[in-house]
């Protein structure tokens, strides 16, 4: 029973960490990353379709993304979707390829993005701590129902705390990597 609670807590903490990584990967650094365009939706015959389903996105160099559209008739729609996104990008098309140059980030914008990364990280830590709280409540319920002893409860709560500490440390590592990436020119 306790092992199931620990396993569930670990799985939920891993999901929280993955969600944090997903949120942080969308924050633009000065470097070209294909994942930057993941959130863009293109109007494809009246339906909003993810760009990834309509085109291949690769980093051409450190400051340019190349978007190769599978269907020539969609080039204008893809270009418009990139232009109207809130990423501040200005695409230009050449044949079936759309080049998206990334403007360099200003120092002030880097600081703003760093604050955003820290806020996302704090939300990630809160999510991990909420998982810990839920697991501890389940363990206390087992003690109350006399399914486990107090010693087993203490041991289980210590294990959950160690798990929480390790995931908070992983969140800090992800944040440090992203902040370093943001501040590198």
From Swiss-Prot:
Supply one GO CC term from the record. Answer: cytosol
Domain of life (superkingdom): Bacteria
**Residue runs in coiled coils:** none
Matches recorded under PANTHER family:
MITOCHONDRIAL RIBOSOME RECYCLING FACTOR PSEUDO 1 (PTHR20982:SF3), RIBOSOME RECYCLING FACTOR (PTHR20982)
Which compartments is it annotated to reside in? Cytoplasm
Q: Matching Pfam families, A to Z?
A: RRF (PF01765)
Q: What is the scientific name of the source organism? A: Actinobacillus succinogenes (strain ATCC 55618 / DSM 22257 / CCUG 43843 / 130Z)
| GO MF term (any one) | ribosomal large subunit binding
Name of protein: Ribosome-recycling factor
Keywords for the protein's UniProt record, in alphabetical order: Cytoplasm, Protein biosynthesis
What gene does the UniProt entry assign to this protein?
Answer: frr
| Family affiliation | Belongs to the RRF family.
General function of this protein: Responsible for the release of ribosomes from messenger RNA at the termination of protein biosynthesis. May increase the efficiency of translation by recycling ribosomes from one round of translation to another.
GO BP, one annotated term: cytoplasmic translational termination
């Amino acid at each position: 029973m306790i092992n199931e609670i620990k396993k569930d807590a670990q799985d939920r903490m891993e999901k929280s960490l993955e969600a944090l990584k997903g949120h942080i990967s969308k924050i633009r650094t000065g470097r070209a990353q294909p994942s930057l365009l993941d959130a863009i939706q293109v109007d494809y015959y009246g339906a909003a379709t993810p760009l990834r389903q309509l085109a291949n996105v690769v980093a051409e160099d450190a400051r340019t993304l190349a978007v190769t559209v599978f269907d020539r008739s969609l080039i204008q729609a893809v270009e418009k979707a990139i232009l109207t996104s809130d990423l501040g990008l200005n695409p230009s098309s050449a044949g079936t390829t759309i080049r998206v140059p990334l403007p360099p980030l200003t120092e002030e914008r880097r600081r703003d993005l760093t604050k955003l990364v820290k806020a996302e990280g704090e939300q990630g830590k809160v999510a991990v701590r909420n998982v810990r709280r839920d697991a501890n409540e389940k363990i206390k319920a087992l003690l109350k129902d006399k399914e486990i002893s107090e010693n087993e409860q203490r041991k289980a709560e210590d294990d959950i705390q160690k798990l929480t500490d390790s995931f908070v440390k992983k969140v800090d590592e992800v944040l440090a990597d992203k902040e370093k990436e943001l501040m590198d020119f």
